[in-house]
């Protein structure tokens, strides 16, 4: 087994005549933190979107847990454990912390034909998981729109980790996360 969780081998991505990525090679170990720095238009977001299954590379290969992978959709990336938190966070301001945390993957209770959303369990999990990364959510039914930008980004990160992200690509953390936050 390789020491690397993710490997990009000579990845290139083109949009018409625009070269977005050219021969990018990088390796990421389990537990490693990597920061991509570059000017606007340097390809950082394209690289993240390629890892997340939004874009298919035109050249090169992606190796994840020693297997060559080809994503047909972002769902494929999620299914193997690649989570992504984008700058816009994909949160709904008018919905609660709990609803945003589970969005489409709500815990259920009841009989097989009569299942309902287990709000008590969901509230408990959302509050606990947010607490684990230093965000005190006194009322998980509060609207996400009442939270700061950093708290919202922590919610999106916490959600990705809870649902099994082995790799977490986070775009523009410096815009909203406090510098003393540990995840």
Q: Language model features by range: what are they?
A:
Residues 173-179:
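Conserved small/polar residues in nucleotide/adenosyl-binding loops
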Residues 37-39:
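The feature captures the beta-strand-to-loop junction immediately N-terminal to the Walker
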Residues 52:
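Helix-to-loop junction immediately C-terminal to a conserved catalytic motif
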Residues 129-145:
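Conserved ABC nucleotide-binding domain
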């Amino acid at each position: 087994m390789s020491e690397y969780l993710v490997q990009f081998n000579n990845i290139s991505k083109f949009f018409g005549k625009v070269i977005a990525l050219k021969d990018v090679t990088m390796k990421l170990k389990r537990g490693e933190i990597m920061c991509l720095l570059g000017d606007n238009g340097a390809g950082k977001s394209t690289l993240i979107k390629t890892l997340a299954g939004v874009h298919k590379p035109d050249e090169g290969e992606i190796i994840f847990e020693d297997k060559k992978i080809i994503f047909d959709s972002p769902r494929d990336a999620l299914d193997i454990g690649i989570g992504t938190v984008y700058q816009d966070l994909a949160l709904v301001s008018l919905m609660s912390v709990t609803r945003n945390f589970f969005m489409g993957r709500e815990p259920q209770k009841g009989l097989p034909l009569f299942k309902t959303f287990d709000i008590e369990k969901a509230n408990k999990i959302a509050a606990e998981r947010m607490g684990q990364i230093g965000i005190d959510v006194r009322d998980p039914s509060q609207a996400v729109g009442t939270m700061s930008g950093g708290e919202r980004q922590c919610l999106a990160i916490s959600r990705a980790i809870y649902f099994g992200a082995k790799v977490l690509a986070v775009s523009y953390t410096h815009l909203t996360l406090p510098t003393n936050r540990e995840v």
